[in-house]
Amino acid sequence: MAASLSELSTYLGERLIGRVNDADIAYGELTMHVEPRNLIEVVTFLRDDQRCQFISIIDVCGADYPSRPKRFDVVYHLLSPKQNVRIRLKVQADEETMVPSITGVFPGADWFERETYDLYGVLFSGHPDLRRLLTDYGFEGHPLRKDFPLTGFVEVRYDDEAKRVIYEPVELKQEFRNFDFLSPWEGTDYVLPGDEKAKTN
């Protein structure tokens, strides 16, 4: 498997000169880093080339690295059923950089790109319907960004008296507690405050 991935990496490096920044093989998967301006050309080649035949899009997802100038990785997972090989493409972007939509090449990427936009705020140029998919219409922010607060900004609940959904500021019912366990791998064999009331066998 590693030999075939290495051969594929060499082949793609020769065929996509200047369009792929670099490629590496890790954990049995080939990853190629691509600039946004080259994405459509690379994806089209991977789909149409007779040796590759990556005809199935598995997923499009995001990753957030706030310390980088281009904080987002948009990651494309493609499958070649004929070759029984997967490939991963990574494109870096920031809040303003628009990544070209690949829905013209893979129509199935439509909701994957909407999900990435909704959860990370990555913008896709040329997308036919770039709007939120998983969060509510009036939702503020993008919940999978590392700088998004754990509690969110508002609390949404259905009010039975008003017979509608209402939005309220987040109200924590108890103060934040930090549990200090000696070892998360061993479990606790000591009594924490309040546990002395519990029966132990």
Curated annotation (Swiss-Prot):
Reaction(s) this enzyme catalyzes, per UniProt: a quinone + NADH + 5 H(+)(in) = a quinol + NAD(+) + 4 H(+)(out)
- Gene3D superfamilies annotated for this entry? NADH:ubiquinone oxidoreductase, 30kDa subunit (3.30.460.80)
Q: What is its EC number?
A: 7.1.1.-
UniProt cross-references to HAMAP family, sorted A to Z: NDH1_NuoC
What's a Gene Ontology MF term here?
A: NADH dehydrogenase (ubiquinone) activity
The record's SUPFAM superfamilies line, in alphabetical order, gives: Nqo5-like (SSF143243)
Sorted UniProt keywords:
Cell inner membrane, Cell membrane, Membrane, NAD, Quinone, Translocase, Transport, Ubiquinone
Q: PROSITE patterns per the record?
A: COMPLEX1_30K
What is the membrane topology noted in the UniProt record heading this document?
Peripheral membrane protein
Its source organism is Mesorhizobium japonicum (strain LMG 29417 / CECT 9101 / MAFF 303099) (Mesorhizobium loti (strain MAFF 303099))
Which family does the record assign? Answer: Belongs to the complex I 30 kDa subunit family.
Record protein name field: NADH-quinone oxidoreductase subunit C
Key word Electron transport present in the record?
no
Locations listed in the record: Cell inner membrane
Q: Which InterPro entries match?
A: NADH_DH_suC, NADH_quin_OxRdtase_su_C/D-like, NADH_UbQ_OxRdtase_30kDa_su, NADH_UbQ_OxRdtase_CS
One Pfam entry name: Complex1_30kDa
Assembly behavior: NDH-1 is composed of 14 different subunits. Subunits NuoB, C, D, E, F, and G constitute the peripheral sector of the complex.
Q: What does this protein do?
A: NDH-1 shuttles electrons from NADH, via FMN and iron-sulfur (Fe-S) centers, to quinones in the respiratory chain. The immediate electron acceptor for the enzyme in this species is believed to be ubiquinone. Couples the redox reaction to proton translocation (for every two electrons transferred, four hydrogen ions are translocated across the cytoplasmic membrane), and thus conserves the redox energy in a proton gradient.
Gene Ontology terms: cellular component: plasma membrane
Record's keyword annotation contains Transport: yes
